[in-house]
Amino acid sequence: MNDSIEIFKRQISHINEIFHSYENLTNDELREKGIQIKITVSNSSDKNETLNKALPEVYALVKETARRFSLGQVVVMANEYDIWLASNYDFVEIKGNKAIYHNKWDAGGVPFEWNMVHYDEQLLGGILLHYGYAIEMATGEGKTLVATLPVFLNALTHQGVHLMTVNDYLSKRDYHLTHPIYAFHGLTVECIEQYRRYDERRKYAYKCDITFGTNSGFVFDYLFDHLATDPKECVQERHNFAIIDELDSILIDEADTPHIVSGGMYYNNEDIYKKHLSLIELSLIHISEP
């Protein structure tokens, strides 16, 4: 393990070299870098190997994006996705042919200003998470920021990334805090905890590149999907890459706490009720007759 960490630490200097080279790019050129990486990943036959090779460049891209957001508004030529975002979220504004990404936005009802840039220890944490290691970070060391690195990288495959937190508040908070960073580079992001089980928007959330939610939310959706009698009722489609917050609590402390689906499915059974009502009434009439 120590040997592996030393290898990963050497990647940090490479990431920072690329990061500094990006400082001279315009905002549009920075976005174009992201587009070119996505094309490379999409055209690859071995996406895992391609992601591993692209890691330094992608982490530098995310770090530079975070730096620019920390300095103020980020202005780029508007595309169709920018226009759609501006009509649905407050962190993007369209003026003429320009999209203005603000560094201040509403994070679930709380005003928030982006002021975070990844430091070396956070880069190391992001590398370890991508390669499947469990890492321990104290409160305040920036777990939310660390997660942006492997989440962004693995979202480039468009096969889905699930980010699981321990409660509803954290999943919504992290979704709101980091959404603009991902959206700036064209990635789609949603949070399942904002919608009920049979809301079509919950199904859309699973189709996004990045999906936030609680571990219980993901588990129960998985269980309900396996109880569904119609494939159209299923919401989860892909199980590609996941990051689990509070891993020790979820996989060790609460490992013996079962997730149980009890009772009927939550579908509209009014038609079934009406169909059998006449038969029930007829039966009651027969019973009451002498």
Where do the protein language model's features map onto the residues?
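Conserved P-loop NTPase motor core
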Residues: 1-284, 288
